[in-house]
Design a protein with these regions (language model features):
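Acidic/His- and Gly-rich active-site-bordering loop/insert found
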Residues: 3-112, 131-140
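Predominant activation on well-ordered alpha-helical scaffold segments within soluble catalytic domains
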Residues: 14, 18, 43, 122-129, ...
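Solvent-exposed residues in well-ordered beta-strands and their adjoining turns
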Residues: 70, 208-212
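Fold-independent oxyanion-binding glycine-rich loops
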Residues: 83-85, 178-180, 209
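Acidic/histidine-rich catalytic neighborhood of metal-dependent amide-processing enzymes
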Residues: 109, 115-194
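A generic structural motif
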Residues: 115, 150, 211-217
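Acidic-enriched catalytic cores of C-N bond-cleaving enzymes acting on peptides and small amides
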Residues: 166-173, 181-190, 196-204, 216-260
Length: 260
């Protein structure tokens, strides 16, 4: 059950998060996904308080929601606040609860998207709805963007929007993106908030192997597939060197100070 100590704003964020989880928006990859129902729900929440949303459908069912909240100072550059509304698949047999139930258990909201990232989507929505109810006007324009397809390359989401509708981001110089980490509770109940400064990059490789042509009816000791498999296994066994940047060293030092 929800604690009675939560503020009205927190309670709304919790409720919205639960509802978002209950609307499956599973991204299966290779263009197979459907965010329309959750996009319609988000658009309705914004419209309800006078924020005008626009849904951009990049392909059937692949929907992005964009809205602009006007700020008090039009001279200041706009700020994009964005999240994604798709989730990875969930095998119900692997869960102790229905992954699309949004149930509250042990003080946590459970379900696919509770961490990545319908929680953040809910906080954004609850906050801007509160702004409208209380009459708060931000200093700069706030552009809300709820993207499709983040879990499978963003082809139908952010890439589509930037390529086909760059005008919605006109005048923006900064963006607040996906949550970068979570607090860690250490000895004595002290809560530490970790700061992320970089992420691992990606390197695509194309491996080519040659062998002797053959047939399934005869053994072949010069098989290209076997040679390719051995190369992939060798990469997998490689022990990468440990490199500690200044940031990582500072992290170790501060953690040691806080935990003793």
């Amino acid at each position: 059950e929800m604690s009675t100590t939560h503020s009205e704003l927190e309670l709304e964020a919790i409720r919205i998060c639960q509802e978002l989880i209950r609307i499956p928006s599973v991204n299966y990859g290779e263009g197979k996904g459907d965010e329309k129902a959750v996009a319609d729900y988000i658009a309705a929440l914004l419209s309800e308080v006078g924020i005008e949303p626009t849904i951009y459908e990049s392909a059937p069912g692949r929907c992005n929601v964009i809205a602009r909240i006007k700020g008090s100072n039009s001279q200041r550059p706009g700020l994009v606040v964005h999240g994604h509304i798709d989730v990875v698949p969930a095998n119900a047999d692997d869960w102790s609860v229905d992954p699309f139930s949004g149930v509250i258990k042990d003080g946590f909201i459970w379900g696919r998207g509770a961490v990545d990232m319908k929680n953040m989507d809910a906080m954004i929505l609850a906050t801007v709805r509160d702004w409208k109810r209380t009459g708060y006007v931000p200093e700069r324009d706030i552009i809300l963007a709820f993207f499709a397809d983040e879990e499978a390359g963003s082809i139908y989401g952010s890439h589509y929007m930037v390529k086909n509708h760059p005008e919605v981001f006109a005048g923006c110089t900064e963006a607040v993106s996906e949550v970068g980490g979570f607090s860690v509770t250490v000895t004595g109940g002290k809560r530490l908030y970790l700061i992320e400064t970089a992420e691992k990059g990606i390197h695509w490789m194309r491996l080519t192997a040659e062998g002797r042509a053959g047939h399934g009816s005869m053994m072949n000791d010069d098989n290209a597939i076997t040679r390719l498999s051995e190369a992939v296994a060798k990469i997998g066994r490689f022990e990468w060197p440990q490199r500690y940047s200044k940031t990582v060293k500072a992290f170790f030092k501060r953690i040691a100070e806080e935990t003793g």
